[in-house]
């Protein structure tokens, strides 16, 4: 038997001796009191030598099948029933005799999911990652410039229909936004533009033209009939959207009108340029 087991048995014996010692010491005292009480019952009381009438009566005894009475009459000089003190049962403090630590148990089953908690505070900035690979090339951005200046060396007379003024001389045509075959400027960069038109009038004829935006008459260039020809001009600024068209139109022949030019000099010019792109704040 090991030293641990012997120590355990010795501790139990000491604990039982401490707990039951006072109880066992009371047993002889109780037996002596019981014996004295029995002797007093047998001997008559010296204080009352004469027998009382109540004692001569026959004591009550229940008949067969009859229960005992619920109460009984006692004399004041009769000895009372001995009262014994209730002692709690002994208890052993297990913590005094603590054993060795046991083995780790098996892992339990996973519990139910709890309620979703509130969003936590923003975390700290993480370390800088590695440099990524080069991406695919993007599309070319639109040029934020637009400008043109063209001229005409041939005279033009009105007829039964409206006529677009077509130009034959190209001074500036940045990115070819002005179409020399149709005589129209096409807007590729939205924004605010400036345009100007210069013509030479014809003697004894009216001069009647419009600067057009798509199919809308924006401004007129007009000169009355005169004995002498003069240079006449018109200019304006317009806000254009992408795919808008700007061109010059000669009025139809209800009223005879014309513009003058010759092959030696350029009398008719039309110019325009971008002032501010729409993408700029």
UniProtKB/Swiss-Prot annotation:
Domain (Collagen-like): residue spans on this chain: 99-140
Species: Mus musculus (Mouse)
Pfam family, one: C1q
Keyword Glycoprotein found: yes
Record GO cellular component, one term: plasma membrane
C1q domain location: 141-281
Lineage: Eukaryota, Metazoa, Chordata, Craniata, Vertebrata
Signal peptide bounds: 1-25
UniProt region (Disordered), positions on chain: 35-68, 107-136
Listed PROSITE patterns: C1Q
Protein's UniProt name: Complement C1q tumor necrosis factor-related protein 1
UniProtKB keywords: Collagen, Glycoprotein, Secreted, Signal
GO molecular function: collagen binding; identical protein binding
Glycan-carrying positions: 93
Basic and acidic residues bias spans: 51-66
Gene3D superfamilies: 2.60.120.40
Major site of localization recorded for this protein: secreted
Location(s) in or outside the cell: Secreted
InterPro entries (UniProt xref): C1q_dom, Cerebellin_Synaptic_Org, Collagen, Tumour_necrosis_fac-like_dom
SMART domains in UniProt: C1Q (SM00110)
Keyword Methyltransferase assigned: no
GO annotation terms (biological process): negative regulation of platelet aggregation; positive regulation of aldosterone secretion; positive regulation of cytosolic calcium ion concentration; positive regulation of gene expression; positive regulation of MAPK cascade; positive regulation of phosphatidylinositol 3-kinase/protein kinase B signal transduction; regulation of glucose metabolic process
